[in-house]
Amino acid sequence: MDRNREARRVPMAAAGNGLSRRRHRAGSFRDSPEEEGPVELPEAARLRDRGGSNKKDRDRERDRDRERERERDRERDRLNSRSKRRRGERLMMVHGNLDDGGDDSSEESVNDDEEYDDGGVGPPSSLKMLPPTSNNISAASFSSSLSNHHNGGSGNLHHHHHSHNNNHQRKNNFPPTKVFRSSPSPAPVSPLVSTWKAADEMIGVSVPRKARSACTKRPHESWASSTTGGGVFASGEQIHRQISSTSPANRVSPASILASPSPPAPTSPSSSSISVRKKLPSGTKQKPLPPKSSSSKLSSPVAVQDEIEIEIAEVLYGMMRMPSTSKQEAAGNDLTEAAKSTVEVKSRVSSPISNPQTLPQSSITLAANSSSSNVSAIAPKRKKPRHVKYEDDNSSRVTTIKSEAEAPSKSQVPFSNQLKSSGSGEGNSSVLDSIIPLTRESNASLDSEKKENNLSKDETILPKVESSSGFRSDGEGAKSSSPEKEKFEIDLMAPPPVRSSSERGGEMMECVAAEAKPKVTEVETEAKPLLKEDRSDPAIHDSQEKKRPRMVAEAEHHKFERNCELKLDLDKSDHVGLVNKHHVQKPPPQQQLSVPDKTAQASHLPLHMSMPGWPGGLPTMGYMAPTQGVVPTDTSSLSAAAMQPPPHLLFNQPRPKRCATHCYIARNIQSHQQFTKMNPFWPAAAGSAPMYGTKACNLSLMPPTELQGSVLGRSSNPVQDKNSQSTSKSSETAQRNQLMLQQALPPGAANSILHGPTFIFPLGQQPHAAATIAAASVRPPNSGITSSGPTATSTSMNGSASATPAGAPTMSFSYPAMPGNETQYLAILQNNGYPFPVPAHVGAQPAYRGAPGQPMPFFNGSFYSSQMIQPPHHQPQKQHQQQLTGQMLQSHAPNNQNGSASTGSSAAQKHLQNQQLRPPINHGNSQGFPTHKVQSQPLNFQQRQQPRENATQHSETVGEDSPSTADSRGSRSNVAYGQNYGMQMQPTNLGLMSSPAPGGGVVGSSSSHGEKKSQQQVSKAGVESFQSPGYAMTFATFNGANTAPTLNMSSIAQNHAMFHSMPEAARQGYQMMAAQAAQQKMNYGASLEDGKSGSIGGAATANNTPEEQRKSGGGAIGKTSGGNGGQSIAFSNKQDLADASVSAVTSGSIVDSSSRLLNLGSALPQSSGSLPTSHHQQLLQQQQQQHMQRSQSQQPYTTMYLQKQQRYATSVAASAARTKGPVVSNGSGFPDHNMTTSPAGTTKFANANSGFPQNLVQSSSNQVQSQQWKNNSPRTTNTTQAQSPSMLSPSTSVAAASSLRNIPHKQQSRPQQSQISFAANSKPMTSGSPMQQVQGGTNHQAPSPPMLVGSPSTSSVSKNASGSPRTTASASSAANKGGQASTTTHSASQPSKNLQPASAASSAGGRNNGPSVLGNPTTSSGSKSQQQQQLPKHGLQPQAQLFFSNPYMQAQHQHQQQQITISPSGGYYIQRHQQQSGSAPAVPVTGAVTATSDPAKAIAAASAANNMKGGGGMGKTQQHQLGPPGFTNVHAVSSAVQVKPVDQKQQAGE
């Protein structure tokens, strides 16, 4: 379609002139210049082979596609007959324009129209129509093109192909066109046409072959870019592709740039455009253009057109040289092309409307390609000389046009994403209107409008405020401004020549603009319309740019070469680049664009900046003017470059090609990278306090810069930018615009933030918080610890730690109250991506905040949340929790970071996967406790965003781009925005982590505010409380309203991942805490066990339930469960991603998870309605499932499982819900509870909770999830999960979903399946036949995995893996039963500790069934709980455990005993953990896990964390090891085991 559109566009644009040119050009490129339509296909094939590097097969395919697309477009487009006519004749061209315009209308239509209008007074009417159509097509084409380009060369080729097809068609009609060109060859047209047609054929203005070739090729790139949906998105790939795939365009015509937007037409129209614009008064040309783009355009304005074509040829030639050079500087190679294209296009555009459209596209494409061009720097390179040559000729006009086009382009980059509608459409519309009446008038109007638009865009976008803004603002005066700016920029930018590539374009543009100023107002006007298009494209370009960071580097080098040629421009450009970078910081509008440009162009610049900045290169930072919290583009741009230099961990990852969120994430990542690079920081991270100092130093070092303006400046690093944003924002601007956040950050804050949450914009709403956040960010105690273990892992892998640290540090820094932690900044850290968790450490002084470290760890998503959450509660709770947890956590700091670490681990894994995952994962994970920072952020975002989770995804995500994305946005949004959406649930998470640093405690705390407080102290009672409130809190928190809940949530989330995950020990401790809380809550919840399920909605209820469960199951578990219930929500966040239920589950799970990471993970999803959850859980489960399914879409892999599972789970949940309602499988208890919560809170929270669980899940999933879910499934499911099954089901479902989400992202394979299976199965099982399942489970005990799969649950199970699904089903039953029994199971699980002996025995006995060693622990735990609850279940459990064990066994036998000791939660976790330990995945966890594992009990907490972390990792490993089968087995066993209990209980419940 894109190709078709492109072809159409080409036809329309090139209809008259473009066609001939294109065909000729194609002919030139191809062997036969004038292959007719029939030959066109082969030609196209050739074209593809050459230009698209597409093979003949592809060609054929494309031809077919082209045909299909054409037909589709035909059908799609209003101009069906026109399409035919277009094919049949010139009208086709018009149709192409119209069609293209139709699609592109949003983006290109306005611009095109405007340009067309500008192009000619007369032509605008007819032609105008074309442009709109063309634009529409372009819009559609743009998206598809972008997609295609993104997909690969195919899109671009497709466009080319379409163009060629259109060309064929046009060629069929071409004779007229050709004739027109030849016939009306008043010399200029003929030569130009000839040139366009065949570079050698005839060129009135002799165009050197090189120029021709370059024109054809490079312009083609632009054209392809443009054609491909405006080529903006296609830029990155397209440029690559374009270079390869340039042939078509190249063939099309040397003026392919012109033709580019409207493939063939643009060239001719471009020429015409120039002439026409000049000759605007003479409507001859213009009128000819409209009628039958080809015939009228060619016929009437044949002479003029020829003339124009000659002119265009000259301009193109010159532009290619000079503008290209300028543009190179401005936009890199692509920019050069864009400039060339813009200049000539603008000139051309001035005349023909068709050209304007085409040209604008071209221009945009070029602009976009500036990004892209980086990749295709080569082509631009060639162009450059020409440009240089031509500089004198067309310097003025081209320059002006280029400048204007470019500046607007840059300005518009951000908007361009919005389509050119905002600025472009706006300006273009007006301009168009103006233009239509009179070219001159139009020009003036256009200029002014453009000015306005540009200004608006600049202001809004932060593109090249300095560079573009000046002249752009001036509009007409822009010329003057431009020169001034040139000087200004030169001075400003003088320092970094490197920047020049980025700014080069801008500077060049300005320079050119200055030169061009005298030239022609018309040109300027034209340029402006083009600019608008350009502007629109830039955003896309940015994406492209991000896509091709490497290319960018090359391009930059090329640019440098070009710059050399354009010495003046280069200097200016450099200055401009610097200015832009610096200014970018200052002027948000300018910056954004600038930065994006830079991304493509400034690779090396950012490099240098980055490099130095990594610790110090913050120049980049400074350059990062865009800190803008948002300015993703900028971020992206810089980020990529900055990142690249230290590609540290992954970053290059921050491929600038992503959305703002992604950019931010990238930036954060970058920052983290820097930090990582600065490794001091890491050690510090481990070292915690030093972090601040050391890290801070390092971090700070650059962060101050970076964070502050610098970081912000580093906006170019999305990550950093974000970070800095966050920091600044938080700290200094927290309230101020978090966006700006940038400079003001307090040095400390900035530093801390710097890496930590990398974005950290804490969202903390209070500046304090921000500062706190920053501080915390810098040195999260947990972070530090976490950092040490996971940090390395996390650090390297994830930014998990980073985020965590951010959070922690926040805490540390927190004094402001911010529990600062919160700071949380979202902290985004996002770390997710960061390879290094900046974290955890970064602030890492566990001591600082004691508990706070954790929050940091959770860094990220929570951050916002937390932050959002007002630290008020947060803090106390958090601290309290942190104290509680802190001890545990701290002990687990690594673990905590396991939360973070685990998260980190997850994050690491995740992060690795995360970027892609991120959105999903972020969604899932992010939603939940951010598994990593990224997750966190997304988590936060997503949680907050939950609603937005999908979108965010997002996150960031984000980003993953990051995304997010979303992440960055959310993050960037900062408080409200990032936080908000993330906040929703995140706050809970935040709160969770924050408040219930321990996880449950806070959660409880949050959950019941009142309770929360008391329970908070309980340590985790809060957990429960926080479940509900958490959710609410989330929002409230975000708003600051419910800090507590948020806090709780946050805590939980954080805790959950961090705490829970983190410390198995903590978990144990947590459990203790939880136990405390649980007991405390138990009071509430004692009765709640099943009954409370109904209360799901209420945190208290949930809490109670969990409490009760806890009590029943064992205080810890119940409590955790309860707390988690509340927390669930928070966690659910993550899960919510997956499912609402997940939300609860997650939350609860997570919290509980702390106690039982497993539960966390397992319960997490399932636990949502822990108690209440049997039903509720199921309900939640359903929600969860829904969410999950939603999520699933997000995470395909997981999703699949998840979905399947979820479906089952849903059904189970539904049945359970129907039957039991909230009776959650208490086993999971809190998962159920979570579920419960989920429904009430989760539902809201679903996403949010999901987030957490995702985190958890992710954490869990990663660590726990896998282990939890894997284990959980098997083990937790078995044990906790047995009870959890229900929970698990939901939890698992959710968790699975989460896990899935996480896992798929992170370890998609292992936990995901297992989890999902498990979860899904649980539900189905529960739903379907708990008994059956039980039976199946029981029966299946041994074969459980398979059998279970076979079991009722099986459907789900089978899906998952044989065992898994069955297990799940079993688990589901069990879960339900467990849920009911869950309390017991859950309790048992958690209490497993309590029950542990029994559990162990049980495990030995029941679980022994399975490999005792392996199975035992898990089994024990689960078994015990379940056993206690229901021996039969236990029997089953053994199976489940067995299976579970198996994986565990495989992973780690040792744990099993320990695990047993650990208790379901602990045991499971531990097991999981150990597994993880055993497995690679546990990296972060590994240490903790290992230690924990062996010590198991002692380390239970750690183990928990480890488990969570390790579990996640391990789970992953397990899953991976076990693989779905193994996992499945495990799950199956779990399920089986659980099934029985579930059956019993569930039936009872149901």
Swiss-Prot record:
**Where is the protein localized?**
Nucleus
Polar residues: bias regions: 241-250, 348-366, 409-432, 713-736, 783-803, 884-992, 1164-1173, 1234-1253, 1274-1296, 1321-1342, 1351-1360, 1383-1397, 1405-1419
- Composition bias type Acidic residues, residue spans: 100-118
What Gene Ontology cellular component terms go with this record? Answer: nucleus
- Please list every transmembrane segment annotated in the UniProt record, as residue ranges: none
* Record's keyword annotation contains Cell membrane: no
The record's statement on gene disruption is:
Plants have a reduced amplitude and accuracy of circadian rhythms.
What's in the keyword line of the UniProt record? Answer: Biological rhythms, Nucleus
According to the record, the residues making up region (Disordered) are 1-191, 207-304, 325-505, 708-736, 779-805, 859-1023, 1086-1130, 1163-1196, 1213-1296, 1321-1435
Q: Which GO terms describe its biological process?
A: regulation of circadian rhythm; rhythmic process
Q: Where is the composition biased (Basic residues)?
A: 157-171
- Report biased composition (Low complexity) as residue ranges: 134-151, 292-301, 367-379, 1174-1195, 1254-1273, 1361-1382, 1420-1435
Mark out the compositionally biased spans (Basic and acidic residues): 43-80, 447-461, 473-490
Q: Where is the composition biased (Gly residues)?
A: 1112-1126
The subunit structure is: Interacts with MYC2.
What does the miscellaneous comment read?
Answer: Called 'TIME FOR COFFEE' because it acts in the mid to late night, a phase at which any human activity often requires coffee.
Primary role: Regulator of normal clock function. Acts in the mid to late night. Contributes to the amplitude of circadian clocks. May act on the transcriptional induction of LATE ELONGATED HYPOCOTYL (LHY). Inhibits MYC2 protein accumulation, acting as a negative factor in the JA-signaling pathway.
The name this protein carries in UniProt is Protein TIME FOR COFFEE
> Taxonomy-wise, where does this protein's organism fall, top ranks first?
Eukaryota, Viridiplantae, Streptophyta, Embryophyta, Tracheophyta
Name the encoding gene, please.
TIC
